[in-house]
A protein has these predicted regions:
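N-terminal basic, amphipathic alpha-helical segments
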Residues: 1-119, 132, 312-318, 330, ...
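Generic structural signal for small/hydrophobic residues in well-ordered secondary structure
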Residues: 51, 95, 134, 148, ...
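Residue-level detector of anion-binding/catalytic polar loops
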Residues: 64, 171, 192, 252, ...
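Short glycine-rich anion-binding loops that position phosphate/pyrophosphate groups of nucleotides
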Residues: 100, 223-226, 286, 414
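Conserved core of the PLP fold type I
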Residues: 119-249, 261-274, 434
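Conserved core segment of the aminotransferase class I/II
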Residues: 280-343
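Conserved glycine-rich beta-strand-loop-beta hairpin in the small C-terminal domain of fold type I
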Residues: 343-354, 362-375
Length: 439
């Protein structure tokens, strides 16, 4: 029979499937309360143990969470839904995407000739000359490069590592606010997110210490160009974080240096300085093009073996054609000059909007990268208000776990000449919002 909650089923599997279907379809939204075990058991005519088993399976899969006396509720970002942004309305200036400016990307031209002969893809999955380039790229910035591997992008690599290292129900420390696709990925793997607060210098050491006390088995962070907040590790913050992390040598530290060359900040890596388990991940999508689904990683020996062992059982290797293209671009003098120009351009655009907002008394954060985070009282009011002025920005809800509200503005394609108008419109919207919602 169906209950007032729309839940049906006579077996644990059937009940769990019914709840999952309701969450997927939206009839049970994020943080909606599920009925107590005994009440649902009575309504369905089954034993409490059957309902408890269904709830346990739903928790394992990241669809619901238990809040002590607060009962069982749908997860804030359930694994069967997505934090994908809404479609951009026609006629608006889109500052929500976080993508690089296409005019600052090189042309992607396939190599004119591939080396002849049969390639031993499984025995030699990585081009030796690309490995050498990667070591020369990452090593001088202080990351140990004895062990290097490749993957089909940062999310692919991080997801593979977490699935090998952790089990459903394990806890992962994640930046808050943080990159929404990573948050979705962790939830989809059935892992529990432990939010870690960030500021302009990245992860806060006190918040990391709290996450370690909560029993996290991995920590995922960005050393610079933190998305969406824009923070980057200072030298002092790096040392403070290492002091905290060295106390838990079994925790895997995953460093996602996604913007590297165009972040506008130096790398202060947590890797290779007393940590036992670590991986430093880099992609090229922000400065060579989003179609290049390739990532390089430097890591400890154990992490390398576990990652490559799982990769071998799935896709096996990253396309050598793709590796050839990446190698060609990373070693091309003209491309390197374009990347340098892109980094300078993004820094100029980011600084221009920060200055214009600050000049109007609007607090904003963006020490590095392509995004600004602006704290607000009401995300919907600000997003819709800016829409009326012709701008489309990202509501912060999809980036947040427990942090205060805000909006993300991508500055990658925002010319400095437009920054003043956006800041003026933002100030007007904030004034209207405070008048409407009581300040």
């Amino acid at each position: 029979m169906a209950t007032q909650y729309g839940i049906t089923g006579t077996t644990a599997k059937g009940i769990a499937a019914s709840v999952e279907r309701a969450v997927t379809e939206g009839s049970l939204g994020p943080e909606a309360a599920l009925p107590p075990v005994r009440r649902l058991a009575d309504d369905l005519g089954v034993s409490p143990g059957t309902v408890a088993t269904a709830y346990k399976e739903l928790r394992r899969r990241g669809i619901v969470v238990t809040r002590g006396r607060g009962g069982t509720v749908v997860a804030p970002a359930p694994a069967v839904t997505s934090r994908r942004p809404p479609k951009v309305p026609e006629g608006l200036r889109d500052l929500s995407g976080g993508h690089p400016d296409p005019s600052l990307l090189p042309a992607l031209v396939p190599p004119s000739r591939l080396s002849p002969g049969v390639r031993a893809h499984r025995s030699m999955p990585r081009l030796a000359r690309l490995e050498e380039v990667v070591r020369d790229w990452i090593g001088p910035e202080g990351v140990p490069v004895e062990h290097v591997t490749f993957a089909h992008g940062a999310l692919d690599l991080i997801g593979r590592l977490l699935s090998v290292e952790l089990r459903p129900g394990d806890a992962v420390a994640m930046e808050d606010p943080g990159y929404h696709h990573l948050l979705d990925l962790v939830t989809a793997l059935g892992l529990r997110i432990v939010p870690v607060a960030v500021d302009d210098e990245g992860l806060r050491p006190d918040a990391v210490r709290g996450a370690l006390r909560a029993g996290v088995r991995a920590l995922v962070c960005s050393p610079r160009a933190q998305n969406p907040y824009g923070g980057c590790f200072s030298a002092a913050r790096r040392e403070a974080l290492l002091e905290v992390l060295r106390a838990e040598p079994d925790v895997l530290v995953v460093e996602n240096d996604h913007a590297s060359e165009v972040s506008g900040a130096p790398l202060r890596s947590l890797t290779g300085d007393g940590l036992t388990r670590w991986v430093h991940v880099r992609t090229v999508s922000k400065f060579l093009g989003t179609d290049l689904r390739w990532a390089a990683a430097a890591c400890d020996a154990t992490t390398l073996a576990r990652h490559d062992g799982r990769l071998l059982l799935t896709s096996g290797w990253v396309s050598h054609l793709l590796q050839e293209i990446v190698h060609g671009l990373l070693t091309d003098v003209a491309t390197r000059a374009l990347v340098t120009a892109a980094q300078e351009t993004y820094a100029l655009r980011r600084g221009a909007l920060l200055a214009e907002l600050g000049g109007r008394g609007i607090d904003a954060h963006g020490a590095s990268g392509m995004n600004l985070w602006v704290p607000v009282q009401d995300e919907s009011a600000v997003v819709n208000g800016l829409r009326s002025y012709g701008w489309w920005v990202a509501a912060g809800a999809r980036f947040r776990s427990s942090s205060p509200p805000g909006v993300r503005i991508s500055v990658a394609a925002l010319a400095p000449a437009d920054a003043a108008r956006l800041a003026s419109d933002f100030a007007a919207v904030l004034g209207e919002s405070e008048a409407t919602y009581g300040g």
